[in-house]
């Protein structure tokens, strides 16, 4: 196991951890259906930027 040679101060530890915080995912509203989806992702019904890009199975 690695063992530190010199103890890190609270300040140095906190500076290292400053980028570790989590943020909520950003959601967008689909233009055609008004459904929420992750930004830059295809919505569950196959639309992206208001256009149908993925063929989805119909419930027949």
Swiss-Prot record:
GO annotations of cellular component type? large ribosomal subunit
Amino acid composition bias (Basic residues), ranges on this chain: 7-16
**HAMAP family linked to this entry:** Ribosomal_bL32
Which residues fall in a coiled-coil region? none
Chain intervals with Polar residues compositional bias = 22-31
Instruction: Name the chain's protein.
Output: Large ribosomal subunit protein bL32
Q: Which Pfam families match?
A: Ribosomal_L32p
Kindly state a single biological-process term from the GO annotations of this entry. translation
| Species in which this protein is naturally found | Francisella tularensis subsp. tularensis (strain SCHU S4 / Schu 4)
Q: Keywords on this record? A: Ribonucleoprotein, Ribosomal protein
The record's comment on protein family reads:
Belongs to the bacterial ribosomal protein bL32 family.
Q: Does the keyword Ribosomal protein apply?
A: yes
Region Disordered, residue ranges: 1-60
Q: Does the keyword Transport apply?
A: no
Q: Which InterPro entries match?
A: Ribosomal_bL32, Ribosomal_bL32_bact, Ribosomal_zn-bd
List the gene name. rpmF
> What residue ranges are annotated as transmembrane?
none
Q: Which GO terms describe its molecular function?
A: structural constituent of ribosome
């Amino acid at each position: 196991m690695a063992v530190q040679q010199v103890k890190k101060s609270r300040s140095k530890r906190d500076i290292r951890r400053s980028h570790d915080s989590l943020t909520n995912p950003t959601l967008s509203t689909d233009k055609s259906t008004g459904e929420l989806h992750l930004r830059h992702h295809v919505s569950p019904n196959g639309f992206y930027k208001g256009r149908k890009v993925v063929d989805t199975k119909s419930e027949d």
